[in-house]
């Protein structure tokens, strides 16, 4: 199975956790994301090096105007899409299996959590994961320590308080 097929499954909204092949591939990419975030978080890097490492995490290039202050954490990495002139401040955590879309000009404050997964409410099905995308629209500012849950789509030009 390839990443493309896994992303199609994740983006379809189908339950995750019932297909062993999907789970194993997701874990493989999670380990890759852990290695790359560890590289970002454990020593000083110039801004262009951070952008390069972040691009490797998400599997696509970010613009020259991208900014990230470490530490940064993601437990998958391959379902993040970043617009132009985006800034992510220190201590952010992205759980992106359900898809995280951050449009142009967005500012993400210190310690923000973007969580796209939920476990099933039925204890017998608790290992199943339900995902939904988060879409941060153009020029949105998310204040420090805010938690944005699965399925949230912001309006344009708003700020979300901490």
PLM-predicted stretches and their roles:
Residues 64, 69-70, 75-76, 83-84, ...:
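Left-handed beta-helix
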Residues 2, 69, 89, 122-123:
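Hydrophobic alpha-helical segments, principally membrane-spanning helices and signal/leader peptides
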Residues 56-57, 80-82:
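Short, T/G/N/S-enriched strand-turn elements that build extracellular solenoid repeat scaffolds
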């Amino acid at each position: 199975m390839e990443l493309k097929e896994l992303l199609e499954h994740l983006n379809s909204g189908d339950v995750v956790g019932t297909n062993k092949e999907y789970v194993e591939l997701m874990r493989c990419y999670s380990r890759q994301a852990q290695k790359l975030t560890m590289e970002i978080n454990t020593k000083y890097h110039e801004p262009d090096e951070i952008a390069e490492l972040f691009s490797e995490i998400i599997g696509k290039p970010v613009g020259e105007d991208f900014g990230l202050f470490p530490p940064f954490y993601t437990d998958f990495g391959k379902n993040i899409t970043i617009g132009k002139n985006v800034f992510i401040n220190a201590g952010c955590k992205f759980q992106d299996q359900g898809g995280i879309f951050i449009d142009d000009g967005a500012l993400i404050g210190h310690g923000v959590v973007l969580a796209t997964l939920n476990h099933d409410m039925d204890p017998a099905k608790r290992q199943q994961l339900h995902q939904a995308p988060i879409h941060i629209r153009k020029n949105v500012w998310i204040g420090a320590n805010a938690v944005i849950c699965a399925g949230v789509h912001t309006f344009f030009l708003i700020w979300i308080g901490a």
